[in-house]
C-alpha cells in the first residue's frame, strides 16, 4: 500500500513562477489567456494608474475578456481578503492579476490561492520578491503582522516590465535592496548544516545575491534604467525569490524578519517600508550574534553593511525608522512579539530573550569593539 504525502518526509520546493517575462514595454504584449475570460485586477491606487494603460491595450486585442478593477485597501488583511473573495465569486472571476508592491501582490496571490484560480503578478516596484514567491504575509487592519501563508504554487506567470519599475519612487528600490540582503544573512543561518543539494545551492545563490547588491546598489540608484540598475532590480525580485523558492523553509526568515514583524506592532511603523524594517533587522540579528556569542565575524559584517546603508539610505538605527521617541517599554513589546514561541528568531543557533533583543535593537549602529556579553 502506498503512503500518502502526509505520511512521508517530503521536501517541497516551489522554485519559480510558471513563466517569467522580462523586458521593456512588455505588459501590453504578454499573453494573459491563462487568466480566462473574466479577470479581477487587484492593485494599489498608484500601481493601477501606472499599469492600466498598458493592460487595456493588451486586452483590447481580446474584446470578449471582461475586466474588473479593484484596489486592495492598505494591507493584506483578513477583512480585505474576504471582501475580494466575495467580489471574485460574485463576478464569476476566472483569474486574478495582481499589480503593485508586496502587499498588493500578497493579497492577489492569497485570493487566487483560496479560490483555486490562476494568478499573474505584475510588480510595479522592486521593493520585495512577492511577485515571485509562493508565500503571502497577512496583517491586521492596523498593519500589525499576523502570519505568513505558504501557497500551493508560485504565480502562473510573472511580468517584469522594467518601464513600470523605473517609474517607482527610488526609495522602493532601496527597500528592496534591504529585503533582498536578508536572504544571505538569514538563509546562511536557517539552512544549518543541511546536506540537501537544493538548500546548499540556494544558500550559495544568496551569497551571490548579497555580493551583487554590495557591489552594485549605489550605481543602480545613481543611474535608473542602467545596467547596474537592471541587475539590482532582477536581484531584488527574481534572485531573492529563487533563494526562498529553491531552499524552501530552510532558506527563509530568521531574526531580521522577526524584528520586522515585531516592529509592525508599534504605532508609527507605517512611516517605513517592509524592506527598511528588514534591513534594520539584519543589523539587529548581527548585534545578537555579537552580544550573545561574542562574534567578531558578525561585527565585521555589520560594519560592512553600515557603510552600504549610509550610501543608499537604509536605516541604521531606531531614529532612522522614526521610532526614536519610543520608550523601553514600547520597544520591549515589539521584542516580545519578535520572540514569541513560534517566531523565526528561534532559528538562530542560540536562545534569544526579549531583553537581549531590546539591547540589540537599541545598539544597531554601535561602532568599535564588541562589548562584553551582558547578563540578560
Predicted regions and their residues:
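ATP/NTP phosphate-donor binding region
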Residues: 1-95
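A glycine/threonine-rich phosphate-anchoring loop and its flanking beta-alpha core
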Residues: 18, 113-205
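C-terminal charged capping/lid subdomain of soluble metabolic enzymes
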Residues: 2-7, 295-376
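Short glycine/serine/threonine-rich phosphate/pyrophosphate-binding segments
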Residues: 49-52, 103-110, 128-132, 252
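Short alpha-helical scaffolding segments that buttress acidic/His motifs in well-ordered protein cores
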Residues: 177, 181-185, 229-243, 282, ...
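A short, small-residue-rich loop immediately preceding and capping a beta-strand
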Residues: 88-111, 115-126
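Active-site segments that bind and position negatively charged phosphate/pyrophosphate groups
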Residues: 195-311
Amino acid at each position: 500500500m502506498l503512503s500518502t504525502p502526509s505520511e512521508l518526509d517530503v521536501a517541497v520546493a516551489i522554485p519559480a513562477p510558471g513563466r517569467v517575462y522580462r523586458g521593456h514595454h512588455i505588459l501590453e504584449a504578454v499573453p494573459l489567456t491563462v487568466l480566462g475570460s473574466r479577470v479581477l485586477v487587484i492593485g494599489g491606487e498608484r500601481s493601477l494608474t501606472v499599469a492600466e494603460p498598458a493592460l487595456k491595450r493588451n486586452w483590447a486585442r481580446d474584446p470578449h475578456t471582461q475586466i474588473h478593477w479593484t484596489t486592495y485597501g492598505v494591507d493584506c488583511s483578513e477583512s480585505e481578503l474576504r471582501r475580494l473573495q466575495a467580489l471574485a465569486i460574485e463576478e464569476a472571476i476566472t483569474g486574478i492579476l495582481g499589480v503593485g508592491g508586496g502587499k498588493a501582490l500578497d493579497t492577489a496571490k492569497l485570493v487566487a490561492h483560496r479560490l483555486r484560480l490562476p494568478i499573474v503578478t505584475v510588480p510595479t516596484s522592486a521593493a520585495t520578491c512577492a511577485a515571485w514567491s509562493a508565500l503571502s504575509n497577512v496583517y491586521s487592519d492596523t498593519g500589525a503582522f499576523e502570519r505568513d501563508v505558504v501557497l500551493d504554487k508560485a504565480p502562473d506567470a510573472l511580468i517584469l516590465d522594467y518601464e513600470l519599475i523605473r517609474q517607482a519612487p527610488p526609495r522602493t528600490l532601496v527597500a528592496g535592496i534591504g529585503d533582498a540582503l536578508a536572504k544571505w544573512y538569514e538563509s546562511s543561518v536557517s539552512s544549518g548544516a543541511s546536506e540537501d543539494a537544493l538548500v546548499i545551492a540556494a544558500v550559495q545563490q544568496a551569497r551571490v545575491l548579497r555580493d551583487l547588491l554590495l557591489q552594485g546598489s549605489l550605481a543602480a540608484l545613481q543611474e535608473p534604467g542602467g545596467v547596474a540598475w537592471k541587475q539590482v532590480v532582477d536581484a531584488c525580485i527574481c534572485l531573492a525569490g529563487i533563494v526562498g523558492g529553491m531552499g524552501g523553509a530552510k532558506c527563509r526568515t530568521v531574526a531580521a524578519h522577526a524584528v520586522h514583524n515585531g516592529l509592525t506592532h508599534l504605532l508609527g511603523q507605517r512611516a517605513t517600508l517592509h524592506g527598511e524594517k528588514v534591513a534594520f533587522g539584519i543589523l539587529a540579528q548581527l548585534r545578537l550574534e555579537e552580544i550573545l556569542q561574542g562574534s567578531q565575524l558578525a561585527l565585521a559584517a555589520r560594519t560592512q553593511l553600515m557603510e552600504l546603508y549610509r550610501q543608499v539610505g537604509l536605516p541604521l538605527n531606531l531614529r532612522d525608522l522614526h521610532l526614536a521617541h519610543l520608550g523601553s517599554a514600547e520597544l520591549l513589546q515589539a521584542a516580545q512579539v519578535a520572540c514569541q514561541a513560534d517566531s523565526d528568531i528561534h532559528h538562530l543557533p542560540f536562545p534569544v530573550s526579549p531583553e537581549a533583543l531590546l539591547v540589540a535593537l537599541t545598539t544597531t549602529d554601535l561602532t568599535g569593539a564588541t562589548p562584553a556579553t551582558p547578563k540578560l
